Regions:
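Conserved phosphate-binding/catalytic region of the ribokinase-like
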Residues: 43-150
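Conserved beta-alpha-beta core of the PfkB/ribokinase-like small-molecule kinase fold
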Residues: 1-47, 64-65
């Protein structure tokens, strides 16, 4: 008790997905990709929030950014992608978005700020070839976020 449970189920196409059922039910922060969704992300988010009630849901939309749903505010909205440097490789983009969001959310408790920073972090990350490179520390991320409007 008292611990935040954050999980990324990656690609999912069914609310009753056997493999992900426990993850969906336990998550306070739930991430997924829009790649296999059978309905528009906003409709999917409404179903996820009604059935599983995570505090926060983020659906990665690739080059279109991300969709955020926040239970306490009854908010559902899209955040655009950021462009901070040329895209070299999108390998690790989703993991970068997830990890940066969790870091920001745990640090501030603000899912809106956390997602904006995570989008910038992920946009920076995809500007390198290797999945093991292209990371920013908090100071560098804060500085970069001042120059990027999301």
């Amino acid at each position: 008790a008292g611990r935040l449970v954050a999980t990324d189920v990656h690609t999912i196409s069914r609310l009753d997905d056997d493999y992900n059922q426990d993850f969906l039910a336990a998550a306070d922060v739930l991430f997924m990709s829009d790649e296999l969704l059978p309905i528009p992300p906003e409709a999917w988010a409404a179903e996820i929030m009604a059935r599983y009630a995570p505090q926060v849901l983020v659906i990665g939309l690739g080059a279109q950014g991300a969709l955020l749903a926040v239970q306490r505010d009854r908010f559902v909205g899209r955040f655009p992608a950021a462009s901070v440097r040329p895209v070299v490789s999108t390998i690790g983009a989703g993991d970068a978005l997830f990890s940066a969001f969790v870091h920001g959310f745990v640090r501030t408790g603000d899912p809106y700020h956390a997602l904006r920073q995570a989008i910038v972090f992920s946009a920076y990350k995809i500007g390198v070839t290797s999945a093991a490179d292209g990371f920013l520390n908090q100071t560098a991320l804060d500085r970069l976020c001042q120059d990027v409007l999301i």
